[in-house]
Amino acid sequence: MSQVTVKDMLQAGLHFGHQTRRWNPKMKPYIYGPRNGIYIVNLDLTKRLFDKACEFISSNVKNEGSVLFVGTKRQAQSIIKEEARRCGQYYVDHRWLGGMLTNFQTIKNSIDRLKSIEAMQEDGSINRFPKKEILLMGKERVKLERNVGGIKDMRALPAVIVIVDPRKESIAVSEAGKLGIPVVALTDTNCDPDGIDYRNPRQR
């Protein structure tokens, strides 16, 4: 069970949803009701669902399953990267490339290219190329690191995906669904929770 309490969530303001005119009716089971034009999230339910999601993720990791954290919103990028690295897992923090899951073998080509450039830079073998080509490979590495750097050591599809904003990452949710990969996501009152296996209603 997580150490986060309902009081912690309340103090963080996670109970404030979106304006009532911007809600998704599918989120009704997770809402107390409106207050001053804003929907209030049922944090008692959020806490139970949060604990359930944590237990599910923990169980997968104990069974050597990997976790992919996805958060490309500017506000989430640094946190996603930091927390994924802290627990030895993987992340996408800038852009979700179409086919990142459903066409993973092709994505691995980009990962292999990134690792190849890194290896040449580290052992100095890149210096056998003309200066112009070295500069181009340097720029290519920056782009590849931005796009696939967070998954360059992910050898197979993840056991579970954790998503900060399922509205923004709808393609990731869709790809996971096609492959039967469970999705854990933060779901605000304006979210469509369909396709999300472990919903965590709260303000995003």
UniProtKB/Swiss-Prot annotation:
<dbReference type="InterPro" id="IPR023591">
    <property type="entry name" value="Ribosomal_uS2_flav_dom_sf"/>
</dbReference>
<dbReference type="GO" id="GO:0006412">
    <property type="term" value="P:translation"/>
</dbReference>
<dbReference type="InterPro" id="IPR001865">
    <property type="entry name" value="Ribosomal_uS2"/>
</dbReference>
<dbReference type="InterPro" id="IPR018130">
    <property type="entry name" value="Ribosomal_uS2_CS"/>
</dbReference>
<dbReference type="InterPro" id="IPR005706">
    <property type="entry name" value="Ribosomal_uS2_bac/mit/plastid"/>
</dbReference>
<dbReference type="GO" id="GO:0003735">
    <property type="term" value="F:structural constituent of ribosome"/>
</dbReference>
<protein>
    <recommendedName>
        <fullName>Small ribosomal subunit protein uS2</fullName>
    </recommendedName>
</protein>
<dbReference type="GO" id="GO:0022627">
    <property type="term" value="C:cytosolic small ribosomal subunit"/>
</dbReference>
<keyword id="KW-0687">Ribonucleoprotein</keyword>
<keyword id="KW-0689">Ribosomal protein</keyword>
<dbReference type="Pfam" id="PF00318">
    <property type="entry name" value="Ribosomal_S2"/>
</dbReference>
<comment type="similarity">
    <text>Belongs to the universal ribosomal protein uS2 family.</text>
</comment>
